[in-house]
């Protein structure tokens, strides 16, 4: 699984763990990625998307089996 959002391109950032004694250790801040079945380039695909893109509505989720059926009211 790649550590990059396919929508916004968000990648891991580098920072520091800082203790109370001000000892510094390097660390990585990974984006919160979720594997989502979505419409991507006109096809239904599983893509890695960050939660901020999902929350902002930038991802069009693929219809599931139950959705999209038209029922007649007779």
UniProtKB/Swiss-Prot annotation:
Signal peptide annotation: none
Biological processes, Gene Ontology terms: translation
One Pfam family cited in the UniProt record for this chain: Ribosomal_L28
GO cellular component: ribonucleoprotein complex; ribosome
GO molecular function: structural constituent of ribosome
Keywords assigned: Ribonucleoprotein, Ribosomal protein
InterPro entries: Bacterial_rp_bL28, Ribosomal_bL28, Ribosomal_bL28/bL31-like_sf, Ribosomal_bL28_bact-type, Ribosomal_bL28_sf
Gene3D superfamilies: 2.20.150.30, Ribosomal protein L28/L24
Family as reported in the entry's similarity comment: Belongs to the bacterial ribosomal protein bL28 family.
NCBIfam families reported for this sequence: L28
Protein name in UniProt: Large ribosomal subunit protein bL28
Naturally occurring in which organism (per UniProt): Desulforapulum autotrophicum (strain ATCC 43914 / DSM 3382 / VKM B-1955 / HRM2)
Classification of source organism: Bacteria, Pseudomonadati, Thermodesulfobacteriota, Desulfobacteria, Desulfobacterales
This protein's encoding gene: rpmB
